[in-house]
UniProtKB/Swiss-Prot annotation:
InterPro entries: Glyco_hydro/deAcase_b/a-brl, LamB/YcsF/PxpA-like
Pfam families referenced in this protein's UniProt entry, alphabetically: LamB_YcsF (PF03746)
Subunit (UniProt): Forms a complex composed of PxpA, PxpB and PxpC.
Keywords for the protein's UniProt record, in alphabetical order: ATP-binding, Hydrolase, Nucleotide-binding
Annotated protein name in UniProt: 5-oxoprolinase subunit A 2
Function in brief: Catalyzes the cleavage of 5-oxoproline to form L-glutamate coupled to the hydrolysis of ATP to ADP and inorganic phosphate.
EC number(s) reported in the record: 3.5.2.9
Catalytic activity: 5-oxo-L-proline + ATP + 2 H2O = L-glutamate + ADP + phosphate + H(+)
Top class in the EC scheme: hydrolase
The keyword Nucleotide-binding is annotated on this UniProt entry: yes
Alphabetical list of HAMAP family matching this protein: PxpA
Family: Belongs to the LamB/PxpA family.
Amino acid sequence: MNNLLLNCDIGESFGAWRMGLDAEVMPLIDCANIACGFHAGDPGTMRRTVALAVEHGVRIGAHPGYPDLVGFGRRSLACSAQEVEDLLLYQIGALDGLCRAQGTRVRYVKPHGALYQDMMRDPAILAAVLRALAAYDRTLPLMLMSTRDNTAARALGEAHGIELWFEAFADRAYDGAGYLVSRSQPGAVHHDAETVLAQALLLARGAALRASDGSALALEAQTLCVHGDNPASLAAVRRIRDALEAA
């Protein structure tokens, strides 16, 4: 069984609004994708989430998104390549500053929501993200979605000198090309803990999933995305962690 790192989007509260069970999920994961204030999060939330990650020895990743608090970063914005670079540099730098104040640093980058999806489907946006990482710190890996064919993404990563960490999702359905089924479609998100655990174990074993079109889908992955938004999803994360450690 592959030794997949568990990553989770975290630090997504904002002001008086609370999102996720951060304190409960942090001890169960390897990598924390911390929101950087544009789609969610604020300076205080970011600083507290960094401290929580340090306490539990969890790697810290910047989780930048489009400037869209109302839409939680799930709506695409018509940004130029230069604007995408600027958005990435601003958000990575903000989180890294809060990290350095606590004796640590950002270790990787994973874009959020619509920016993540746009990056996966538009090579120009992916190239802009890679240029931002190269400009800020060429040693930072980029976490991105594993699909049926990672050849083009891998070539762009190599061209920019950026390491890629391919990820798969335990609680999402995939289409035939290996992309995530849109959240607007029925069955796009798995809510049943047994289904989430079964998919996580298939991915850890390198076995094929069943895509929404019925085809077999094999995904290359170094890390597995999980969510701890509610008690049910938290229970699924705990079961995945236990299963991976027992394997």
